């Protein structure tokens, strides 16, 4: 039975099989170069796919965690978690946003990014990779819309999130994704946003970031 055919009867489908299948599809969309759209971050292709997984397996997380946990504990070697520096303060990014609703979306996404970044840095080795995909499923639909519209502030947050993947390059399906995404985002937002907000990300991607907390910077 294909996943498409199984979805209408997903209550009857074995939850672990549905979770694994949908996760493999998300990884495929993440890794496959054929889904890349010119001039647009590839994250905008795989974010919606990844965000659909929790909805598919809603109500079955305890079963999935129990059955799949032993297999998920076998992780290939990767860079030490301590090589990922603390996330700089990004709250000033919201300055200049006049619409309270839009500002709230940025603030919430920033809060979720800080949470996801800290979870990723502290995660045990077997769950380190999985923790890197926490932020996309935590942000709101409203923030995802801002990303799709290429709003500079949203793309700045996306670039900071993408820096996580610079420490996961040993995985064949991740590779140089962090660098590729950053280059696309830099072109979209322009020199001013790049200079003020993306220098730290560039340093992380190139392995030059300090372990000290980044300095807060203002921006329009």
What feature does the model see in each segment?
Residues 1-38, 160-167:
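Hydrophobic/aromatic-rich effector regions of fungal transcription factors
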Residues 42-220:
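C-terminal effector modules of eukaryotic transcription factors
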């Amino acid at each position: 039975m294909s996943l498409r055919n199984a979805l209408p009867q997903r209550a009857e489908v074995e939850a672990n099989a549905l979770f694994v299948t949908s996760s493999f599809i998300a990884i495929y969309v993440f890794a496959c170069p054929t889904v890349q759209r010119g001039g647009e971050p590839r994250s905008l292709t795989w974010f919606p796919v990844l965000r659909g997984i929790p909805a598919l397996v809603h109500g079955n997380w305890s079963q999935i965690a129990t059955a799949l946990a032993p297999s998920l504990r076998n992780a290939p070697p990767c860079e030490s978690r301590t090589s990922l520096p603390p996330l700089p303060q990004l709250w000033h990014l919201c300055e200049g946003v006049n619409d309270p609703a839009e500002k709230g979306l940025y603030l919430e996404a920033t809060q979720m990014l800080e949470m996801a970044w800290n979870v990723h840095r502290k995660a045990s080795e077997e769950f380190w990779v999985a923790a890197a995909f926490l932020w996309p499923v935590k942000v709101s639909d409203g923030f995802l819309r801002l990303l799709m519209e290429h709003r500079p502030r949203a793309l700045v947050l996306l670039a900071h999130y993408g820096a996580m993947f610079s420490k996961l390059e040993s995985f064949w399906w991740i590779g140089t994704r962090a660098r590729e995404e950053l280059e696309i985002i830099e072109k979209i937002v322009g020199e001013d946003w790049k200079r003020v907000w993306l220098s730290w990300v560039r340093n992380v991607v190139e392995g030059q970031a300090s372990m000290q907390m980044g300095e807060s910077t203002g921006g329009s």
